[in-house]
Amino acid sequence: KNALKQAVTVAQTAEQVGFNRYWLAEHHNMRGIASTATSVLLAHIGAHTSTIRIGSGGIMLPNHAPLVVAEQFGTLAALYGERIDLGVGRAPGTDGATFRALRRTMNDAENFPQDVQELMHYFDPLDNQTVIAVPANGLNVPVWILGSSLFGASLAAALGLPYALSLIHIS
């Protein structure tokens, strides 16, 4: 509970001193890290800030259906306008036991490029698309690729998306 309060305080302080962005990472089963429900915490932070961009650094896309991520971040954009950033990564963001509890399989990360494209189409639908993400449809939510390898950087370049390099995950 204290970490949740501190996340708001840090975001407010960052806003007051002139930072442009405040992002939260998705992590599971880690004491002291309270951003397991990243979009929920971002909604809370958005309600307590007014100008700073808030976003995910990042949502581990293989843990979620792209439709649900688009709906959540579309809702955030509907509430907070162009203050929302959506960073996505392909790592599990957790340990092996929690990986299994999230119902992930080893193949989930292999689908990351297709999942990113599906996610992008929920914000900018194709003409023949049958599933529409409400309220994401037509909203400008910048999608960032997060990574620590050439794979992520290459994918971002191929899709014309911004890339955020994680220096702490490079060995």
Describe each PLM feature range.
Residues 1, 127-134:
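N-terminal small/glycine-rich loop or linker at the start of catalytic domains
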Residues 1, 62-124:
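Flexible, glycine-rich active-site loops centered on histidine and acidic residues
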Residues 1-52:
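N-terminal beta1-alpha1-beta2 module of alpha/beta enzyme domains
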Residues 1-4, 59-66, 141-147:
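Active-site mouth loops of central-metabolism enzymes
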Residues 22-24, 54-56, 84-88, 143-146, ...:
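Hydrophobic faces of well-ordered beta-strands that scaffold small-molecule active sites
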Residues 42-50, 77-81, 157:
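Acidic (Asp/Glu)-rich catalytic clusters
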Residues 168-170:
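Conserved small/polar residues in nucleotide/adenosyl-binding loops
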